[in-house]
Amino acid sequence: MLIPRKVKHRKQHHPRQRGIASGGTAVNFGDYGIQALEHAYVTNRQIESARIAINRHIKRGGKVWINVFPDRPLTKKPAETRMGSGKGSPEWWVVNVKPGRVLFELSYPNEQTARAALTRAIHKLPIKARIVTREDQF
């Protein structure tokens, strides 16, 4: 799982989900990528599930890059707890994804297999996304 080793503050405010991504919108390392089309919080478990889906489909001969890191904690109070008595304990780690952000990149020789692997990964994510290639950008 992707979680920060050490953080300055255990609990953070939730960022507003607005605007579009200013950086990380291009495929830099691989040949194909998954680009977000809407706002969402993507958890560390969803990122890991998508990574496993890609790796199981391509088996060997390819390389996967994860371009996002879940660095924000989301808190939750226990069930059947009365209101008040402070903020809950950190439960998940999420990344605030904005439209245009490239989440995963993949380098693989066969385009059809690469697109199939990325499609499987998109189904694991809680956002609408599309597959982009390095040639699409320029």
Curated annotation (Swiss-Prot):
Entry keyword set: Ribonucleoprotein, Ribosomal protein, RNA-binding, rRNA-binding, tRNA-binding
Q: Where are the transmembrane segments?
A: none
GO cellular component term, pick one: cytosolic large ribosomal subunit
Coiled-coil segments on the chain, per record = none
GO biological processes: translation
InterPro entries (alphabetical) = Ribosomal_uL16 (IPR047873), Ribosomal_uL16_bact-type (IPR000114), Ribosomal_uL16_CS (IPR020798), Ribosomal_uL16_dom (IPR016180), Ribosomal_uL16_sf (IPR036920)
- The organism's superkingdom is given as Bacteria
Identify one Pfam family in the record: Ribosomal_L16
State if Ribosomal protein is listed as a keyword: yes
Q: Where is the composition biased (Basic residues)?
A: 1-17
Q: List the disulfide bonds.
A: none
Q: Name one GO molecular function term.
A: tRNA binding
The segments labelled Disordered in the record are: 1-22
- PANTHER family recorded: 50S/60S RIBOSOMAL PROTEIN L16, LARGE RIBOSOMAL SUBUNIT PROTEIN UL16M
Assembly and partners are described as: Part of the 50S ribosomal subunit.
Q: Which family does it belong to?
A: Belongs to the universal ribosomal protein uL16 family.
Q: What is this protein for, i.e. what is its function?
A: Binds 23S rRNA and is also seen to make contacts with the A and possibly P site tRNAs.
Checking HAMAP family in the record gives:
Ribosomal_uL16
**Name of the protein described by the UniProt record:** Large ribosomal subunit protein uL16
What organism, scientifically named, is this protein from?
Mycolicibacterium paratuberculosis (strain ATCC BAA-968 / K-10)
The gene behind this protein is rplP
